Design a protein with these regions (language model features):
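Leucine-rich repeat
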Residues: 46-49, 69-73, 92-94, 115-116, ...
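Concave beta-strand-loop units of leucine-rich repeat
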Residues: 54-66, 77-88, 96-110, 118-132, ...
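N-terminal capping/linker segments that flank leucine-rich repeat
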Residues: 1-82, 242-258
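Helix-centric, low-specificity signal for extended rod-like, repetitive segments
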Residues: 9, 20-22, 90, 112, ...
């Protein structure tokens, strides 16, 4: 019995020491991050001492990145959060849990996944021109404003995209995108999938578009069979589809043959 109690006591002390080291490590990382920042006064540490919060805009530069990750784990951001143009960023581990306005991680050529991205974003979410991004899994389930994943050369599917987007959804110029399945089911604005040269079908697009719909420049698109049933704005399609729009499709704007 004494041996068991000794083991429990030993394990407790070991855990306590480990927890203390982790806590000190977090504080050291925060100190290192804030030491050369002129905006250090906008930050605060969460009550559980696990996250760094901010009540204004946060901009992360490539020199802030540590081992391919964000410098500290962030919690709630009361403004914008940007970690764009960070060539060495590999992972969004440590990204904020919530961003009140914009979250931008565009032009990060080494980023391969959105795992770790905020679950709540108030305005825009942009991961455009992340040329190594292979999946949208990890993106927030809802983007209240715009969602932009355009020019992501390695993206082959929209699986993982938000289920609901308040305004526009842009997946244009994704040259290896093979399918639109996984696209938002609810959309409050335009849908742009133009210049996706390997796209062969419109399967997966929302049935109703509240802005323009652009599928021009998709040279391998073979059919307009799954075109949205109602388009509130203009429709942009290739010249080869002139006169081939399904009769049950309502376009309230102008049909533009690109």
């Amino acid at each position: 019995m004494e041996k068991i109690n000794e083991n429990i006591f030993h394990q407790y002390n070991k855990w306590k020491q480990g927890y203390s080291r982790k806590e000190n490590s977090f504080k050291q990382r925060v100190q290192n991050f804030l030491s050369n920042r002129e905006d250090a006064d906008i930050y605060s540490i969460s009550k559980d001492s696990k996250y760094l919060n901010a009540y204004y805009n946060v901009v992360i530069h490539d020199e802030d990145i540590r081992d391919g990750k964000l410098p500290v784990p962030f919690g709630e951001i009361r403004g914008d959060f940007e970690c764009s143009r960070c060539d060495s960023l590999i992972s969004l581990e440590g990204a904020p849990k919530r961003v009140d306005r914009k979250f931008e991680c565009y032009n990060c050529p080494s980023l391969t996944s959105l795992e770790g991205a905020p679950k709540e974003v108030g305005w825009l979410f942009s991961c455009k021109r992340c040329t190594s991004l292979t999946s949208l899994v990890g993106a927030p389930e809802e983007s209240r404003d715009f969602f932009d994943c355009s020019s992501c050369d390695s993206l082959i599917s929209l699986e993982g995209a938000p289920k609901k987007v308040g305004k526009n959804f842009n997946c244009s110029k994704c040259k290896n995108l093979l399918s639109l399945e996984g696209a938002p089911k609810e959309l409050g604005g335009a849908f742009d999938c133009s210049d996706c040269e390997n796209l062969t079908s419109l399967v997966g697009v929302p049935k109703k578009i509240h802005g323009y719909f652009d599928c021009s420049g998709c040279e391998n698109l073979t059919s307009l069979e799954y075109l949205p049933k109602e388009i509130a704005g203009d429709l942009y399609i290739g010249k080869r589809f002139k006169g081939k729009i399904p009769e049950d499709v309502i376009v309230k704007g102008v049909i533009q043959y690109e």
